[in-house]
Each structure stands twice: as structure tokens, then as C-alpha cells.
Amino acid sequence: MAAVSFDEKVLAAKKIICDIEGTTSSISFVKDVLFPYALKHVEEYLKNHWSEDATKTVVAALREQADEDKKAEVEGVVTIPAGDSEDIIPDVVKNVEWQMSQDRKTGALKTLQGLVWAKGYKDGTIKGHVYEDVKKALEQWNESGRKVYIYSSGSVDAQKLLFEHSEQGDLIKYVAGYYDTKIGAKQEKNSYEAILKNIEATGEEALFLTDVVAEAKAAKDAGLNVVVLDRPGNAELSEEDRKEFTVISSFTDLPIESVKSTETENGAEKETVTESTEKVADESEKETETETAAAETENGAEAENGASKRKIDETAQDDEAQRPSKVVKVDQNGDSPAVDGAKQNGDSAEEPATLSETNGKSTGEDAMDVDAEMTDVESSSTTKAAEAGTGKVTEKTETEESPKEKETEMEAEAEVSKTDEKEDTKQQGESVTDGEDKKGDVINKNAEDDIKVEEEKNKEEESAPPTKKAKIEEDKMDVDEEDSAVIEKKADNVDEKPVESTTDEVAKKEENLVETPVDTAKPEVTTSEIAVTDETKEAPSDAAKEESVTSTSKTEEEKSDDLVPTTTSEQTVEKSSAEKTESKSEEETDSGTSEKKVEDKSANNEEEQKEPKESVVAEKKEEEIKVKTADEETKSMETDEVTVEKSNTKEVKDDNEQIPDSKADQDFNAKEAAKETVSEELEVKADAIVPADESKPKAQNDETKEKVTKAEEVTKTAETKTEEEEAKKTEEDAKKTEEDAKKTEKEVKKTDEEMPTEEIKMKDEPTVPEKSKSVDEPMATEESVATKEETLAEETSATTEAQATKEDEKPVDTKTNENDKTTPEVKATEEKTDDAKSTEVATATEEDKEMKEANSAEESVETKEKKTEETHTTDEDKPKESDVAKPDVVEKQEEKMETSEQVDETKGVEATTAGPVEEVAVEATEEDVAMEAESSDAVKEETKTEEPKSKVDKLDSEAMEVDSASTSQNEAKNESVKPAETAAVEESKTESDVVSTTSTDEVKENGTSEKVNTKEESRVPENGEADSKVTTNGNHDEKADSDKENDTSASNIEEASSATTTTTNGTSTESDSSSTTPSSETVAEIKSKKATDAVADSATPSVETES
């Protein structure tokens, strides 16, 4: 490769700005390693770090960028919805993938990439690629005094990670600052101008290294020197680009040595070096001045700082090229290597810029101002302290009038070597003067402090004699003036030597209170301090406090007589030194005699001080003992009272526990015992209260009284509980008796209910007339059925029996007067029915009486009337009501009564002569009898006793055959009826679940013709009309009354046979009904009328079918 010619400005550049991708690192590393890693782990990073502030910030920035792209109508932009939930993570990932596919360089994208890459760098999966020539170049540039900056599209964090975790090690120490796209885009001129301002350099002083021509042009426009890198894998450069810019393939192509020579030969550089040295010299002079002033002061911290600064300045004067004071400051910000190089080349004015260049935003001017302010503040503070310290030192020397300068030098050296010790002792001395520190603070000193104090004393003793001589030769007044001056200094916390001596002496004094040290004399401050500490430690009563105060006042008065030995510890030091000088030299006899007098006085004062202290301590101890004994006595009294109270309360509780368990006879005795215990407790507590009143306030007596009242309340509550329990027991006994009475009443009612049913059965049996053997068998079956139904009769209520009695009474009262036209045969039947009625009425009256005793007849009557009204309106519900309300026994009773009524009704209906009219009359009686049989059949079907019903029907048919045997005409009719009757009975068995039964004949309503044994008979009655009957005279009598009676009687049977059409003698008819629609009851009436035709000629009436 041909040699490259460089412009002098390029070689003279002091600030080098480098790109990363294609310049310091390969493009393939970014595209093949970093980008794929970011795409692969971005989602994982977002999920694991979603709650972190950095993640939230970068996501918000990505959202804003997407919104801007959408407004700019960027093709394919992927927006991110608002919100902080993790549901938007997939949208964020899509946005990142879209931007990376477009090779975008947005700040938000680069920031997120840097966060993702950080994980890879830290765990070692990623190592930053750097060309081999980069590390060498960075080292050489730093050694030559140049500063290196990085400007890349990647984030600052990513840049640092790459150089920190590079393949060639940690290179971050060679970089002075980092800039990313936050300062501006790399292809814009303004970005480079901003960087120049930040690093405080001109365009001619800066060099920009890049691989992108567009970036090079922008930097050139900003006035920077530019060199283009042609690395492997970079974009090819055109001939025009090569002509316009200097092109190199490695950093080693830059002539670093020539850069060094140009710097040394450049006059401008020399001027900057001289300026910097002059500044350093000025600063060093100021620091030496402050150091000397601080050395004379007694402030340990300032003296230490001054000494250190003096050493630093001395080293700076020896070697101007190295300035560690400022190098140290810059090193704290990570820019030490660059700063060192800059200082070696006289670059001190620009070095603070590195403090704020890492973020790419702050300016170097601000950094320099801050550094300058720091130095000014330090110098001002040291000078002020030095002035104050020098003023005090001069004041001290004037009062002491020491002719020697060695004393001050010795003191300064001692102060510098003991700065740490003085800080601790200063704080302790201040606390001692204020009277706040106590014994523990002084005792906790280390053995090292004691050794140092002894060394200080030796030094002070060596320096003290000449001053003492001068003082003793003059006058005692001078000594008093010196003491007063020292006291003032001590108040201002300037002189620390007396403080140290006093603290040491205080510690020794407190450790050995009994012994009397000779060498140390207690000053006035320390004696008052001891009194204060005694007050704080031992102050149990007011009397003790007063005594302690008086003791301190006495000691102060005694000390006021002689100020010389009691003012300061400095005087005590002089005393000890004076004793030594007496043994050494005879020339100081005068001073020795004076010092002996002073010592005698101090010893006397110490003895006088200790005597009142010991007396005070003894008095305090005695008082404390008295107070403690009094407290113990009071506590013992309290405990005795508490134990007595506890024992009494336990006794009361035991009594209360026994009271509920005792019987009624022992309640009175228990109450009296409780009262006695309470009275005894009161007496015991009264005895206990008497001594308590002597040592305790009235509040304790009130508490004992309250406890006694509580005990009384406990006994009262126990008594009330026993009374309440007794009342509860009596109430429970009364309830039990009431329940027993109710049970007996219920049992009596049940027996009463069972008795009438048995009596009814007994009375019903004789009413049935004796018949032939064929009739006895059905009766037996009926009796068996009745016995089975007795169990059901027992469960019936009193209301059903009352209903039965009323229904029995009604037919008796509803007799018509149409009995004038009767035949002798009908009269015979009438007599028999009357007998049956009388027996039935008798039974009814007896039942009525029994039911009145049960007080339920009225309620049953009311319920019956309501039911009858309902049945007239709704015929369809009649079968259901009859099923629920009627028991079998009562229904049998009603059937018997109805047969008797129907026979009576036939008296005014039957014809007295033979013929067709006679047949009609007989049919009427037959229909009544058939109706009775039908009602019994219907009731039996409801109770699911179909077998007895069929037998009753057969019984009726046999009776009809016997009655019709006398006439041949009726025999023919009966023979024709039997097959139809048997067919009807069979049909009724098959349709037992249904309430109504139908015969083989068809029933036609509204008077239409109907078939009876294949014969037609004309019918006239309409709904609501009365049946007309033809008498012997040919007149027509209306049977409206009788029909109505039949209707009412049928409804009183709980409508058991409502909507039923039964057959008798093979005929099926319709009868009038009181309801609006034709019912089965009217049909049954007409059938019974026709049945009387077949029975008219027979000698026996139809009463035989009552059963």
C-alpha cells in the first residue's frame, strides 16, 4: 500500500473521536453477533425486567417513536398500545423486530439493545470484538497526551460494555468520554459541533475516525479533521471519496511519533505548558501559606490537611510534569490515564471536561467551573482558619511572654502528630466543661491514649521551665492574668492542652476517689463537674439534691480564696515541673519556695474538697437506704393485702359454685353463710386497711372498698341465679302437667269417636229384615267389609260424624204430605220404614249428643254447607270431594236413610190401580231403590272395594226376581233385565278407577229416545223441568218437590254419585237436576222410578235393599 500523506493538522490533533462499527470493531460482529442476540433475548428480557424503571422508560420511548412514525406515515410501522401491563410485550417485540429489519438507528431501539446485550456481556456469552491495532493505538495516544472519545449510534451503555468486555481485555480506561445519538445524528453537522463544545476543542484540534463517508462529510462540514477507515467487510469507497478524505486501513498507519515531535516543537503547546505550571505554582504558594497558618492553630483536622497539602506541593515543585492533586480528582471519575497524559503535555486547562463527557450532554465549562470552585473553597476555608488560629496563637504568646521560639515549634509538631487524639479529647473536654459527660466516657479510653498523654506531659514539662522562670521573676499578678487568659481560651475551645490534662486528671480522680493524688490538682471546673455527676447519679430525694448543691457551693467558696492552684491544669503542669527543677538547680530557690506554697495550698484544698464529698456521699447512701426500706415496707403491705383479697375471693367463688347445686331447703343456709363470709372479709380488710392508710394514699383504700363491693355483688348474683333456676323448674313442671292433660284429653276423644261407630253398627243390624238364604250371603260380605273399614272409621275426625248426623236429620224433616193416595200395599211398606226411621233417629240423636260433647258439630256443619255450595257450581269436582270427605261407615248410614226417604216419597207418586200408570208408579219406587244401590256402589268404588259392590247388585237383582215371581208379565221383564244388569256390573268393575260408570245402553240427553233392551221409550223431561206422573184419574202431578229432595239428598252424600249413570233392570235414564247441566243424579232418579214397575205387584217392598 502506498504511503499516505497526512496533513499537519491531523497529526497535531489533541482530541481523537472514534466510531465503533467498521472502525474499532468489525461490522460482522455487530450484525452477526449483537443483533441476533438482541432479537433472540429481547422478549425474555422484557418479561424478567418488566417492573424495572429502565425497562418502563425504554418502552415509553419506543411507543413515542412509533407514534411519530405513524404520523409521518412510515410504511410498515408497528405501534405499541398504551398501558403498563405485560400484555403489550408482544407488540414491543414486533416493533423492535421491525426497526431492526429496517436497520434503524433510533435512540430507543439502541437503548433497549444495550440493556439486552448487558446480560450477554456479564455472563460471558458475548465478548466485544476489537481489532488488534486498537489497543496499541489507544495506549500510545494516551501516552502522548491525547484524549480519545467514542461516538457511535449504539447507546453509551452498550459502548462501555463492548470496551469493558472486549477480546483484548478492559479498554475502558483509555476512553475519556462516550457519545451516542442523544447528542445528535451522526450524519448531521450540528452533532459534531455539539461534541466540540462539550470537549472544549476547536475543529482543527479534533480528529474524527469513521468508515462511513456521509458521517465523514458531516464532521468535515463542522470543521473537524477526518480520516476514513477501510476495514475488511466495510463498504467500498469510491475514487472520489478517496481523493476527498485520507483513507487508512489500521490505526497503526497514523504516525504517532511525529505527533509527539510536533507537540514539543509547537510554540502554542509550550505556552499552554507554561501557563499551567504558573497556575500550579500559584496554587502551591497559597497552599503553603495556609499550611503554615494551620500548623500554628490547635485545630487538628486543619493541621493534618495542611501537612498533607504541604507534602503534595513539595512533590509538585520537584516534578512539574506530574500533578497528583488534580490527577486524583479526575481518577475518581474513571479518566485518570487520559488526564495523566494531558497533564504531561500541558493540558491542565482542559482536563476537567472528562468529568461530564460520559453522558454526552454536560459541557466541559461546567466541569471546569466546578473544579475551580472546589479549589477556591478549600483555599478560603484554610486561610480563614489560619487567620483565626494565628490570632489566637499570637495572643497566647503575648500573655505568656515566652522568649523562646522552640516552644511553639514543639507544640506545632506535637499537634500535627496527635490530631486524631486531639479530636477525641476535644469532644470529651467540651462535654466535661458543660457538665454533660459522665464517668463512663472517660473510663472507656484506650491504653494508647494514656501513653500519648504521658508523652505530651513530658514535652510540656520540657518546654514549661523557661516560661515559669519568667513568670515567677515578675509578679503573682502576672500569673493571675495568665490564668484568666487561659480560662478564656479554654471557653473558646482553642487551647487543648489544659483540656487534655483536666480530662486525664478527672479520669484518675474518679477511678480513685478514696486516694489523694499529689501531682494533679483539681481545677474549679472539675470540682463543680464532679458535683453535677453526683447529682445525676445519686438523686433519689429532694433532700439529697439540696445537700449536693450546698456541697458544690462550699467547695467553690473555699476555692475562691486562692485562685492560683485552682484555675487551670496548666498551672498544675507548672507545679509538677517546678518540683523537678528544685531538685536539679539551686538557683531557682525563690521559684521553688513559691511553688511549694502553691502545692501546700492545693493539697489543703483537695483535702477540704474530699471531706465534704465523702460526708455527702455517706448522707446520700443513708437516705437511699431509708427510702429503699420504706418502699419495701409498702410493697410488702400491698402484697399482703392482695393475698388476703385473693383468698377471700376464692372462698366467695367456692360458695357461689355450691349454691346452684344445693337444694331449695339449703338455699337459705347458703345465703346466710355467704353473708357471714362477706362480713368477715370486710372485717379482715378493715384491719388490713389501717396500716395501709399510714403509708399509702386514700386511693388504695378506695380500691379495697371497690373489691369488697364486687365480692358482695358476686354473692347477690349467685342468689338471683338460684331463684331464677327455681322459677324455671316450676314453669317446666307446669308445662309437663299441661302436656299430660292434653294427651289424656286426646285419648278420651279417640275412645269417644270409636264408641259411636260401634253403636251405629249394632243398631244398623236389626233394621235389615230377614230374607231368604240367598240374601244372607251378601250381608255377610258386607259385614266383613265393615270390619275392614273400622280402622278407617277410627281415623275420621269429629267433623265427619257431625256431617253424618245432620244429613240423617234432613230426610226426616223433608217429608211431603202427598200420602193421601196410597194403596194398602204401600202402607205396609210405610209402617216398616217408619220403624227403621225411628231407630235411625234414635241413633242420630245419641250421636248428636256425643258430638256436642266434643264441641265440633258447629264447625262440621259450616264446612259441610260450604262444600255443598261448591258442589252445585262445579260438578266436575264432586267425585274428588267425596273421596276425601266421606268414610265408608258414614256413607252406609246415609244410604240406609236415603232408601227410607225414597220409599216415603213413592207414597204420593205410585198409582193405586193396575195398568200402565201403575207401572210408572212402581218404576218410581224402583228408581229410588236403584239410586240407593248406585250410591253404595259408587262409594265402594271410591274406596276400592269393588267386590262387595258387585255382590250388593246381585242381591238387588235376586230380590227383584223374588218380587216379580207372582206375575208372569214382570217375569219376562226381569229375565230380559238380568243379562243387561250383569253386563252393567262387569263394566262398573272394569271402570272402578273412574267415578262414573255407564251401561251398555246409550244415554241421550234432553229427552231424546234411549234404548232399553233394544226397545225405544219416549222421554220428555228437559233440564230443570219436573217429571210429570199420571195418576189413576188421568191427572198429572209434578214431582218437582220430590226431585228436589232427591237432589239435595244426593248432594248431601258428598256428591259421591255425581256424574254417574247406573243401570237398574237394564234401563238407563236421565233425571232433572238442580244444577244448570243435566247430572247423573236425575238419571238415577228416573231409573229408580222405572224399577218400581217391576216391584209393584210384589208383596215385599223395596226396603229390603237397604243394606
Swiss-Prot record:
Substrate binds at S152, S153, K186. Binds 1 Mg(2+) ion per subunit. It is an enzyme of class 3 (hydrolase). Bifunctional enzyme that catalyzes the enolization of 2,3-diketo-5-methylthiopentyl-1-phosphate (DK-MTP-1-P) into the intermediate 2-hydroxy-3-keto-5-methylthiopentenyl-1-phosphate (HK-MTPenyl-1-P), which is then dephosphorylated to form the acireductone 1,2-dihydroxy-3-keto-5-methylthiopentene (DHK-MTPene). Residues 258-1107 are annotated as: Disordered. Belongs to the HAD-like hydrolase superfamily. MasA/MtnC family. One of its GO terms (biological process) is L-methionine salvage from methylthioadenosine. Monomer. Its main location: cytoplasm. Its cofactor is Mg(2+). Residues 260-289, 393-427, 435-462, 486-512, 534-548, 572-586, 593-604, 610-686, 693-776, 804-838, 849-908, 937-957, 1001-1028, 1035-1047 have a biased composition (Basic and acidic residues). It holds the Pfam family Hydrolase. It catalyses: 5-methylsulfanyl-2,3-dioxopentyl phosphate + H2O = 1,2-dihydroxy-5-(methylsulfanyl)pent-1-en-3-one + phosphate. Pathway: Amino-acid biosynthesis; L-methionine biosynthesis via salvage pathway; L-methionine from S-methyl-5-thio-alpha-D-ribose 1-phosphate: step 3/6; Amino-acid biosynthesis; L-methionine biosynthesis via salvage pathway; L-methionine from S-methyl-5-thio-alpha-D-ribose 1-phosphate: step 4/6. Keywords: Amino-acid biosynthesis, Cytoplasm, Hydrolase, Magnesium, Metal-binding, Methionine biosynthesis, Nucleus. Residues 291-306, 794-803, 909-919, 1048-1083 have a biased composition (Low complexity). NCBIfam families: enolase-ppase (TIGR01691), HAD-SF-IA-v1 (TIGR01549). GO terms for molecular function: acireductone synthase activity; magnesium ion binding. Its EC number is 3.1.3.77. The keyword Lipid biosynthesis does not apply. Disulfide bonds: none annotated. InterPro entries: Enolase-ppase_E1, ENOPH1_eukaryotes, HAD-like_sf, HAD-SF_hydro_IA, HAD_sf. This is Enolase-phosphatase E1. Residues 366-376, 475-485, 920-935 have a biased composition (Acidic residues). GO terms for cellular component: cytoplasm; nucleus.
